Structure formats: C-alpha cells, structure tokens
Amino acid sequence: MKLPDKVLRALELASVWHLGQKRKHPLEVIPYIAHPVQVGYLLQSVGAPDHVVAAGILHDVIEDCGVSENDLARAIDQRTARLVTEVSEPKDIKDWQKRKDAFLVSLSKASKQALLIKCADHVSNLRSLIEASKASPDVWRMFGGDREHKLAYELAVHGLIKMKIKSPLVALQASLLAKVTKI
C-alpha cells in the first residue's frame, strides 16, 4: 500500500519537529514520534481522510514544538493546520487544571474531525498510561495532575467525544478508560 503524499509529508514534518523528544515512561526511552505515528495509524484504521490522518500525526506540533498555525499551513496546508489548532491546548495557561478546563470549553465547540483526532490521541495516551503503570505504580505524576484530576479530565474528554461522533475509536477509548480507572 502506498501512503498518500500528505500523510508522508506529515510524517516527515513530525519527525523533524519532534526530534529529540521522548515519551513519558518510567523505564524505557521511547522516541516521541511513536505517539503521533500511533495516532495517525488509528485514524487511518477507521478510514479517516488523508488530511485528518496528517493532522493526527501533527497534532502536538503547535502545543509541544513551538510551530505556529501559519508555519504549519505553509508546510502542509491550511485545512490540516486548522485541525491541529483545534486539538491544541492553550499555550498561555500554565496551571494544569485551568489549561485543561479551558481546553474542554474549546473542545466542546470542535469539529467532528478534530474530535476524532483527539479521540485517537487519547487512545494512544491511555495505552501508554496502562503500559507505564505496569512498570511504576506512581505513574499518575508522569502524566500531569494527580490520579483524581487526570481521570476526571479523561472522562470529560470522552464524554464530549461520545456525544458528537460515532467511531470504533470511541468504543476503544471507553474500554481503555475502564482499565485506567482500575490503576
């Protein structure tokens, strides 16, 4: 199978912009690029259009790499860049809880394509949380906030997503959340 040009370009850009970043894990050093690739794969597996898969691969570059929406639009296209902006948390709010609360407000107004990307993102992150918990019972601190607040946030994101989109990823997110609540 040949990957579409837009998806290949997204992989190239994400590889450059995430270079040197690592995933949060108590024992293993996992290059960060593994996460955007997982998100893109999940989106492709449910038949998302190429620009949505590309935005999924690039979903963290505005938030974590200092890339602007304009720079991203020039590098790939405006539609993809707009989706990445929709799934990016506000950079100017430093407090974890306030940032998450503000993001939930913006997520409640997000497009269905952005919600699908956020769902794939959370599926990947929940899988990582479950795997990391096997190595360290104190995994919650690594993923921001304490257990109670992190779980509340994950449940709130899932609640918003399941009200607005139908996808096998939503059911997978629910299944992973059920496992995470037992950690």
Over which residues does each language-model region extend?
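Active-site helical microenvironments for divalent-metal-assisted chemistry
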Residues: 1-183
